A protein has these predicted regions:
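Metallo-beta-lactamase
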Residues: 12-105
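Active-site HxH/HxHxD metal-binding segment of metal-dependent hydrolases
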Residues: 1-9
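Residue-level detector of beta-strand structural context in well-folded domains
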Residues: 3-4, 26, 172
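C-terminal regulatory/interaction regions
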Residues: 111-184
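Residues that act as N-cap/strand-start positions at coil-to-secondary-structure junctions
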Residues: 1-2, 22, 168
Length: 184
């Protein structure tokens, strides 16, 4: 529960609300060692997709407030939900604020980022999939359809998916082998 403490091992960890990525997210902070378990609230190079924003609920301000909380805690070590443990929290917070500012100024950029993330995580599960199977999955997945309808309706769904695949290829996250998309 936020604003409480939990004993993990022999250390008391503070529980802090960290809405943004998810309205019910928390971070854990162990003040003696200055260790923060940040979940998806802060990564070394960003933060998690802000799902409420994609669904039409304003949550970018909550991400900013969560970054303020983390900054006030002044962690010496951050254990993120994704990526390596890191020690330069001020740099990570500054980078996260710049990314957030870009998303606030251009919400479509956030929606595109989210679509690529969702596709990449599914590709991590599959490891490879025929492009026809990918198209069938995208068409049958309600959240993916909502993302397209809400943020990219002006682009035909098949062209949008093709563009997402091309973005994953450009970034080195995937490659095509014939008619199959392969995770990298």
């Amino acid at each position: 529960m936020p604003d409480s403490c939990v004993l993990l091992g022999d250390k008391p960890w503070q529980v802090h609300a960290a809405p943004g990525h998810d309205p019910h997210s928390v971070v854990l902070f162990e003040p003696q060692g200055g260790v923060l378990i940040s979940a998806d609230a802060l990564w070394e190079n960003g933060f998690g997709v802000v799902f409420p924003e994609l669904e039409g609920e304003g949550a970018f301000a909550e991400v900013a407030a969560t970054l303020d909380v983390i900054e006030k805690l002044s962690p010496r070590v951050v254990i993120p939900g994704h990526g390596p443990v890191f020690a330069d929290a001020p740099r990570a917070i500054d980078g996260a604020r710049r990314r957030l500012d870009g998303f606030v100024r251009n919400p479509a950029k956030h929606a595109l980022y989210a679509a690529k993330v969702l596709l990449k995580y599914k590709l991590l599960e599959w490891q490879q999939i025929p492009l026809a199977g990918l198209a069938a999955w995208a068409q049958a997945t309600p959240y993916f359809g909502m993302l397209h309808a809400r943020h990219f309706a002006e682009v035909p769904a098949d062209a949008w998916l093709h563009g997402l695949v091309a973005e994953l290829e450009r970034s080195g996250a995937a490659r095509r082998e014939g008619l199959t998309l392969v995770n990298l």
